[in-house]
């Protein structure tokens, strides 16, 4: 062994030793990001790839009145350790009460109706925003917030959390806390008689129900203290990030929406027969929700493992970080998907682009083909292909 080789060997050996220590003492657990890169995830380590599909909108979820929250966590979809999602509908006058998520940031996309949110941060800033279909919000992990339906018609939105376990030990609601805190403690905290809390709810309300909110929100007790970074981004009000023969994509990460440090969101439209071509994401898991249409999603998991799932409107899919995949519209009308990544900076490696970037002799040897064959391959990243192949 030469000296540089020996040095590399020693560094690698030290890495294996520390990995063994880690895996020997600690199974992969919620909030432990190490499982994504180092410790094999038992859910995805079997001979066959597990299912990566869950029929979210067909599930029952939590229903109060005409409002609901349906969730996809590791309980419903065991492979989805990095990201959880919720479909939530609020009836007019309903509010998802003041709460926070101890172990997840919240990213959302509005499908129908209008929503108002107020979010409060540790610097003492609060922002109240109104949202329309196509708009996005992001609340950093642990920041207090509420969501309420505006107007006389229901609203429907999809929430994405950067932790697949978030539901089990993640949601802290204000009524749950106040309802269980001793009255003398509440009296001292707020400078009120204990009796002031007699008729407060005793248990978590979750969906509070009241009047339809005013056109303009009423002023908080301490007035408005607006944060330096907004929590709202109007995704579909922008032109698409990329337009191709076969489809188009809108994308927002922290480069355009600075507060969104841990989530990237995408709206992917595919024409019939269109394909988001074979690719992987080096730095993030991918969570998919079909807004409309029928798609076929493939997953490549190494060691010959390959799995295909068909997703339709209301279904959820999940692609682990670094796994190869593709999405094809197999219906006869356009498809639209909401896709979330647990990263603030979007990255992709597309197979077409990787091939185009390698020396021809490498490709020839690798595939046992004449080098001239590869001249016919695309000389660029395809990203989205149309029904009859890559556009110009
Ligand atoms: Mn929330
Ligand atoms: Mn992808």
Feature locations, PLM:
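Ligand-binding loop in jelly-roll beta-barrel domains
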Residues: 141-167, 321-347
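A short, N-terminal "cap"/entry segment at the start of jelly-roll beta-barrel domains
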Residues: 22, 27-87, 185-271, 277, ...
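Mobile, glycine-rich extracellular loop/lid and propeptide segments
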Residues: 97, 107-110, 116-119, 128, ...
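Histidine-centered metal-chelating micro-motifs
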Residues: 95-97, 116, 136-137, 141-146, ...
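Short acidic-glycine-tyrosine-enriched beta hairpin
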Residues: 122-138, 302-318
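Glycine- and acidic-residue-biased ligand/ion/polar-headgroup-sensing regions
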Residues: 102-122, 281-302
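N-terminal secretory signal peptides and thylakoid transit peptides that target proteins
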Residues: 1-17
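Short histidine-centered beta-strand/loop micro-motifs
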Residues: 97-101, 128-129, 148-149, 277-282, ...
């Amino acid at each position: 062994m030469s000296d540089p080789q020996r040095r590399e060997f020693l560094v690698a050996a030290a890495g294996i030793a520390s990995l063994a220590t880690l895996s020997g003492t600690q199974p992969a657990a919620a909030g432990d990001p190490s499982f994504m890169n180092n410790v094999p995830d038992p859910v995805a380590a079997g001979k066959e790839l597990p299912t990566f599909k869950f029929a979210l909108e067909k599930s029952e979820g939590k229903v109060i009145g005409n409002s609901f929250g349906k969730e996809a966590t590791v309980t419903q979809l065991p492979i989805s350790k990095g990201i959880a999602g919720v479909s939530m509908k609020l009836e007019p006058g309903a509010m998802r009460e003041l709460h926070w998520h101890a172990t997840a940031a919240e990213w959302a996309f509005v499908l129908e109706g209008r929503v108002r949110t107020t979010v409060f941060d540790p610097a003492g800033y609060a922002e109240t925003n109104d949202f329309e279909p196509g708009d996005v919000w992001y609340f950093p992990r642990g920041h207090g917030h509420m969501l309420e339906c505006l107007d006389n018609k229901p609203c429907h939105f999809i929430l994405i959390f950067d932790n697949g376990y978030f539901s089990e030990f993640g949601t802290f609601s204000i009524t749950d806390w106040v309802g269980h805190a001793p009255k003398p403690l509440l009296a001292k905290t707020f400078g009120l008689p204990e009796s002031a809390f007699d008729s407060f709810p005793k248990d978590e309300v979750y969906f509070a129900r009241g009047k339809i909110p005013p056109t303009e929100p009423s002023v908080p007790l301490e007035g408005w203290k607006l944060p330096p970074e907004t929590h709202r981004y109007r995704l579909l009000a922008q032109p698409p990030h990329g337009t191709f023969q076969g489809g188009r994509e809108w994308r927002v990460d922290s480069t355009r929406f600075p507060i969104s440090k841990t989530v990237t969101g995408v709206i992917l439209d595919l024409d019939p027969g269109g394909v988001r071509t074979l690719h992987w994401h080096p730095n993030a898991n991918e969570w998919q929700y079909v807004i409309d249409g029928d798609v076929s999603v493939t997953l490549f998991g190494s060691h010959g493992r390959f799995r295909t799932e068909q997703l339709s409107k209301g279904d959820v899919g999940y692609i682990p970080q670094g796994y190869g995949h593709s999405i094809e519209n197999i219906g006869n009308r356009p498809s639209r998907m909401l896709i979330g990544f647990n990263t603030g900076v979007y990255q992709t490696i597309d197979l077409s682009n990787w091939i185009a970037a390698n020396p021809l002799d490498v490709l020839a040897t690798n595939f046992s083909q004449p080098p001239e064959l590869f001249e016919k391959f695309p000389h660029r990243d395809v990203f989205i292909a149309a029904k009859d192949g890559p556009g110009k």
